[in-house]
Amino acid sequence: MKIAIVQEWLVTVGGSDKVVKAIADVFPEADIYTLVAKKQVCGELGIDWNKVHTSFIQKLPLGVKRYRMYLPIFPFAIEQFDLRGYDVIISSSHAVAKGVLTKADQLHICYCHSPIRYVWDMYHEYLEESGLARGVKSYLAKYILHRIRKWDLISSFRVDYFISNSDYVGRRIQETYRRDAVTIHPNI
């Protein structure tokens, strides 16, 4: 059985990155797909760099250092991974990882850390903190976030089973996507 693990990015040693490492420890032959990654961070996590596949964002100017500026193309980028050769896809998602394209004969399990906060429950706070609540730029930002919100909801139906990292996140998955989730607390 071929397994792929999908994560948004591996650029810091954070909670979701440690979850990816824990999943990779259970499935050591799995390949890891991520939008961008730092070799040093993968080394710190004990993730084999040769198993890591990055998206085209990795090669864009400041793609690794300032990857968040490419938010508008994250959905497009995650859909470019060709996962046809895998039987099982396990996404560790707090943004777009769950949106990978899969086939009907593949099993997609999403370990969800959160629905995308900046397009759902923290939308207005995100705009204010980013200085995008008012002015000309706000219209473009709101339009982009609106498009990502629609994509996020549609992409939630690509997941066969949701696992939440807490009961609270499980309730947010139910409220946002109208999908049930089983809670498995992270062992990190």
Regions inferred by a protein language model and the residue ranges of each:
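Active-site donor-binding segments of glycosyltransferases and PAPS-dependent sulfotransferases
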Residues: 26-98
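Carbohydrate-associated surface elements
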Residues: 168, 187
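Nucleotide-activated donor-dependent transferases that construct or modify glycoconjugates
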Residues: 1-13, 35-36
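Short beta-strand scaffold positions
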Residues: 91, 163-164
